[in-house]
């Protein structure tokens, strides 16, 4: 803000012009991942976390949605919310398996409504609440997630209808007259080999 870096509580960290870029060690830690050594090209680092979305609520408090790698066929979605005094970091959904071989941490992704961070949209190939497989293809779900919610208390609504196609990479698009949840639908083999359409639903 105004050329400065701050922690979530407003504590000044440094000035970009005078002090240079922010180092990871200077930033505020929200989640501690694993510290294990390199394993293989087919596995991700232990408990590696990937940020997918960051937005602010009406009070200006940040909310961070991210994925957490546990295994190639077991990833989770988490949401960290600042309440003005502390972070509330919790698991909110099963993210399912990796999208394809050699990219162990690639998920269908999680996103937040830019006007309401409690409105969460995800893509997963398992039941978001139980982790039971859906049949191989990723589907898109949405839910309202309160600060005290976790995987067991959230009610997910499925949005995508096609069981035979991948439904991935959702985003919430807000406009003056219309608001739309969009995602990519089709065949996704790798990040350079895909045949996808952009589809969406108004809400």
Q: Model-derived features: where do they sit?
A:
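Extracellular, repeat-based ectodomains that mediate carbohydrate processing or recognition
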Residues: 1-203
């Amino acid at each position: 803000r105004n050329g400065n870096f701050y922690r979530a509580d407003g504590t000044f960290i440094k000035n970009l012009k005078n002090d240079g870029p922010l180092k990871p060690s200077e930033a505020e830690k929200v989640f501690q991942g694993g510290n294990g050594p390199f394993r293989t090209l087919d596995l991700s680092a232990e408990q590696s976390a990937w940020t997918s979305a960051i937005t602010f609520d009406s009070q200006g408090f940040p909310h961070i949605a991210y994925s957490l790698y546990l295994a190639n066929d077991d990833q989770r979605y988490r949401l960290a919310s600042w309440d003005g005094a502390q972070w509330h970091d919790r698991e909110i959904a099963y993210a399912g398996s990796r999208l394809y071989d050699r990219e162990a941490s690639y998920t269908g992704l999680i996103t937040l409504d830019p006007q309401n961070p409690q409105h969460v949209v995800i893509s997963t190939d398992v039941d978001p609440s139980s982790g039971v497989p859906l049949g191989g293809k990723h589907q898109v779900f949405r839910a309202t997630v309160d600060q005290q919610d976790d995987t067991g208390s959230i009610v997910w609504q499925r949005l995508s209808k096609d069981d035979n196609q991948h439904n991935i990479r959702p985003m919430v698009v807000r406009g003056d007259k219309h608001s739309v949840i969009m995602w990519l639908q089709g065949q996704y083999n790798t990040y350079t080999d895909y045949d996808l359409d952009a589809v969406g639903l108004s809400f």
